[in-house]
C-alpha cells in the first residue's frame, strides 16, 4: 500500500497566528494561509484559491513562527490531516514540517 502524504503550499497569512503551549509543554502555532494562483487544467487556465489552516508544532519550528504575522508570505511543506472541531465538523489541516519566508522585495 502506498502511503504518501505531502503538501507544499505558498500563500499569505490571512488570520492572526495563535500561539499556545500544550499541557505537555509542546509549543504550537496555528494560522490560516490563503493561496491564489493560476493553474492549467485540461489545457485551460483556471483560478485556484483556498484557505488552509496550518499548525506548526515543536521547539525547533518556533523560531520562524515568531516572525509570522498577517500579511506574511510563506511556503509551507508538510502533511495533511483531518481535525474535528468542537462543533463536530471536520476540516483538513496542514501540519507544517518546513516553513520558508518569501521575500516580498520591499
Curated annotation (Swiss-Prot):
It comes from the Bacteria. Keywords: DNA replication, DNA-binding, Primosome. Gene3D superfamilies: Nucleic acid-binding proteins. Residues 4-103 form the SSB domain. GO terms for cellular component: primosome complex. GO terms for molecular function: single-stranded DNA binding. SUPFAM superfamilies: Nucleic acid-binding proteins. GO terms for biological process: DNA replication, synthesis of primer. InterPro entries: NA-bd_OB-fold, Primosome_PriB/ssb, Prisomal_replication_PriB. Belongs to the PriB family. Homodimer. Interacts with PriA and DnaT. Component of the replication restart primosome. Primosome assembly occurs via a 'hand-off' mechanism. PriA binds to replication forks, subsequently PriB then DnaT bind; DnaT then displaces ssDNA to generate the helicase loading substrate. Involved in the restart of stalled replication forks, which reloads the replicative helicase on sites other than the origin of replication; the PriA-PriB pathway is the major replication restart pathway. During primosome assembly it facilitates complex formation between PriA and DnaT on DNA; stabilizes PriA on DNA. Stimulates the DNA unwinding activity of PriA helicase. This is Replication restart protein PriB.
Amino acid at each position: 500500500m502506498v502511503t504518501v502524504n505531502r503538501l507544499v503550499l505558498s500563500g499569505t497569512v490571512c488570520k492572526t497566528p495563535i500561539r499556545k503551549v500544550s499541557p505537555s509543554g509542546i509549543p504550537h502555532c496555528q494560522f490560516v494561509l490563503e493561496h491564489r494562483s493560476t493553474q492549467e487544467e485540461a489545457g485551460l487556465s483556471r483560478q485556484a484559491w483556498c484557505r488552509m489552516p496550518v499548525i506548526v508544532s515543536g521547539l525547533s519550528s518556533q523560531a520562524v513562527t515568531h516572525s509570522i504575522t498577517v500579511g506574511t508570505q510563506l511556503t509551507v511543506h508538510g502533511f495533511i490531516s483531518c481535525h474535528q472541531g468542537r462543533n463536530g465538523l471536520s476540516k483538513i489541516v496542514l501540519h507544517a514540517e518546513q516553513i520558508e519566508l518569501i521575500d516580498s522585495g520591499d
